Amino acid sequence: MRTIDKRIAPNVRLAATLDTGEDVALVLPRGTVLRDGDVLVADDGALVRVAAAHEAVLLVRAPDALTLTRAAYHLGNRHTPVEVGAGCLKLEYDPALADMLTRLGATVERASAPFQPEAGAYGGGHRHGHDATFAEDYALAQQVFDEHHGHSHSHSHSHDHDHDHDHDHQHGPSCSHGHHHGHR
């Protein structure tokens, strides 16, 4: 089996060199995220294993959950790709971010390791509301919300008064309870 040793990223078109020295070009469906250990099938039927390459990263740890959560919040606020681990965060090496995280009380260590950031809440890449895919993204977010809450409702009137009401619904096969939705 041949191997691609490449930074794993959500690219539609990817040029890589296999461990055999062979140059290859990949064309992947939009939103595909290659992960370490994935296996691709070449046009000739050959199998190619994906191996995450080592790169300069920051390993972020904290003395407590609150400090690590604050670090994650500030990284997310900057749209920084982050790999979430048990008790640590991993991100691309960036001295400015290392300084910020240290000032927040985190312990930051520079290392060389594979980096596989989270794909995002709804899969695919990072997009903003002005993109052509906003309607598609918004519909997906609404679908996830409706699946979680088991219902949907809308309000087309002014919100300058209280209109509290209850909905009974289930959150899972064994969880049934009244759930209050107070809207202002």
UniProtKB/Swiss-Prot annotation:
Sequence segments annotated as region (Disordered): 147-184
Gene3D superfamilies xrefs: Urease metallochaperone UreE, N-terminal domain (2.60.260.20), UreE, C-terminal domain (3.30.70.790)
Location (main, coarse): cytoplasm
SUPFAM superfamilies: Urease metallochaperone UreE, C-terminal domain (SSF69737), Urease metallochaperone UreE, N-terminal domain (SSF69287)
Keywords: Chaperone, Cytoplasm, Nickel, Nickel insertion
Chaperone among keywords: yes
Superkingdom assignment: Bacteria
UniProt feature, compositional bias: Basic and acidic residues: 157-171
Subcellular locations according to the entry: Cytoplasm
BP-aspect Gene Ontology terms: protein folding; protein-containing complex assembly; urea metabolic process
Listed InterPro entries: UreE, UreE_C_dom, UreE_N, UreE_N_sf
GO CC annotations, alphabetized: cytoplasm
A Pfam short name: UreE_N
Function: Involved in urease metallocenter assembly. Binds nickel. Probably functions as a nickel donor during metallocenter assembly.
Family: Belongs to the UreE family.
Protein name: Urease accessory protein UreE
Lineage of source species: Bacteria, Pseudomonadati, Pseudomonadota, Betaproteobacteria, Burkholderiales
Record gene name: ureE
